[in-house]
Amino acid sequence: GREWLQNTFGITPQYSWAIDPFGHSAGQAQVLKELGYKGMLIQRVHYAVKKQLAEKQQLEFQWQTPVGEIFTHMMPFYSYDGPHTCGPDPSICCQFDFARIGKGKTWTGCPWGKMAVEITEHNVAERSRKWLDQVYKKAMLYRGKHVLIPIGDDFRYQTMEEAHKQFTNYQRMFDWIKVNVPSLSISFSTLSRYFDAARETNVPKLQGSFFPYSDREKDYW
């Protein structure tokens, strides 16, 4: 796949997005380092390990390998879907997965009973503050000044309608935040832009593998 991207588009990936393997080995980090990757993002790590690393602000680290180290970002919560990416409360974050507005597919509505709604001039202040509260809480788990908030899930962005819902509503909040919370810089971004900024952070060095995997008590995969 890497060679195909290079031969077809002249692009060589520099950052890895690995959100769904059930655990992560040190060999994975070594192979990516040998291939020239600058950083990697991982998600499925034992929930108790995540908790311990979050308490120490060690969810970003330099993963040590026999061939060098690679900057690694570990997502902090249960899953990589919309309800589990903006902050610690999925019942709130789900309200900002705007693909759930109106008719949809399997992701219609939120299982916590609080639905996503369109952002308007009448609710933008309240909605933005509620979203930012979650973002601030997530930021406390990391040492750096940059916060990564992925927007999506499995099988997403298959229609222009969904993309419009997501980007239009987030842009309305971003516009409000830029005016009313000028101390923050907020924008749509890419994984590479995030890593280029986050790598400036002084992070710990860790080694070893993240096995076995469990996402909740006694549920081992």
Model segments located where?
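Catalytic-domain carbohydrate-binding cleft regions of carbohydrate-active enzymes
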Residues: 1-221
